[in-house]
Swiss-Prot record:
The modification Phosphoserine is found at S300, S301, S336. This is Protein Tax-1. It is found in: Host nucleus; Host cytoplasm. A motif (PDZ-binding) lies at residues 350-353. The gene is Tax. It comes from the Viruses. The keyword DNA-binding applies.
Length: 353
């Protein structure tokens, strides 16, 4: 990645982009080989370790001289201060073709997906609602990717400030080899770093096919899975499971959910049960980053992070939102072994948009 004084090349198009947010910990210091006090600069694409007075590129590990040389310049805070040239630079290329998304996919997503902030409107290849992005130059487009024979909607908010990352969907089905229309000439290693940052910052679930990233940045391992009814938000205790967050796979028409549980009977740190977690913690937060910032949940370190996999290459849309598994009207939810009360129906029912 080329660097120039006073300018940091973005992951995508070579112009300044808000990418990683405010001082996200998790980059390894090349001197100590550990986390040290390494932090990622605010609105920068370089990491620095104040303890060792060293700055490096977190993608390829190349050590650089002065950190101040390569900080991405801040954009004006208000849209009125942004010129037409700035907006032109920040506007991503337009996708020429819009895939035909089956209406059943959007209907199921509206009805059964636990939207962040209680509301998210799918927009079929158009921009997101204007209220979410006050500046049109920073409003990304939806990205659709083919997964086997199915078309799955995926949002990559690469061109938006981190404050909008909570709008990411809960599950991202991603095949790096099929992102060429959006991420042109981007090495897999850089995509891998981007996916890790999104996962670390937003808690989004990134489901990737096995062996799709042939780099050594991650050491993928197929994590064990446990079966459970997803509406009660609880998982059996699995002491050997080290994968952070949730792995949500589908096979034989049955949702298979796995995730780390702090203690036997306690709720797993899964996004599908986020309403239940927030209810128990008596907070109005709608995003796992709130729990992460308050030390209520923990993610594994950089090298022990496992990417998420799907056992098969084809995920039919009917399996993404299984009405039988999502419908808890026919029976009362069972009390978990730990005695915690499962969330009520209202936590998992979304009103029609």
């Amino acid at each position: 990645m080329a660097h120039f004084p006073g300018f940091g090349q973005s992951l995508l198009f070579g112009y300044p982009v808000y990418v990683f947010g405010d001082c996200v910990q998790g980059d390894w210091c090349p001197i100590s080989g550990g986390l040290c006090s390494a932090r990622l600069h605010r609105h920068a694409l370089l990491a620095t370790c104040p303890e060792h007075q060293i700055t490096w590129d977190p993608i390829d590990g190349r050590v650089i001289g002065s950190a101040l040389q390569f900080l991405i310049p801040r954009l004006p805070s208000f849209p009125t201060q942004r010129t037409s040239k700035t907006l032109k630079v920040l506007t991503p290329p337009i996708t020429h073709t819009t895939p035909n998304i089956p209406p059943s996919f959007l209907q199921a997503m509206r009805k059964y997906s636990p939207f962040r902030n209680g509301y998210m409107e799918p927009t079929l290849g158009q921009h997101l609602p204007t209220l979410s992005f006050p500046d049109p130059g920073l409003r990304p487009q939806n990205l659709y990717t083919l997964w086997g024979g199915s078309v799955v909607c995926m949002y990559l908010y690469q061109l938006s400030p981190p404050i909008t990352w909570p709008l990411l969907p809960h599950v991202i089905f991603c095949h790096p080899g099929q992102l060429g229309a959006f991420l042109t000439n981007v090495p897999y290693k850089r995509i891998e770093e981007l996916l890790y940052k999104i996962s670390l910052t937003t808690g989004a679930l990134i489901i990737l096919p096995e062996d799709c990233l042939p780099t050594t940045l991650f050491q993928p391992a197929r994590a064990p899975v446990t079966l459970t009814a997803w509406q009660n938000g609880l998982l059996p205790f699995h002491s050997t499971l080290t994968t952070p967050g949730l792995i949500w796979t589908f096979t034989d028409g049955t949702p298979m959910i796995s995730g780390p549980c702090p203690k036997d009977g306690q709720p797993s740190l899964v996004l599908q049960s986020s309403s239940f977690i927030f209810h128990k913690f008596q907070t109005k937060a709608y995003h796992p980053s709130f729990l992460l910032s308050h030390g209520l949940i923990q993610y594994s370190s950089f090298h022990s992070l496992h990417l998420l996999f799907e056992e098969y290459t084809n995920i039919p849309i009917s399996l993404l939102f299984n009405e039988k598994e999502a419908d808890d009207n026919d029976h009362e939810p069972q009390i978990s072994p730990g005695g915690l009360e499962p969330p009520s129906e209202k936590h998992f029912r979304e009103t029609e948009v």
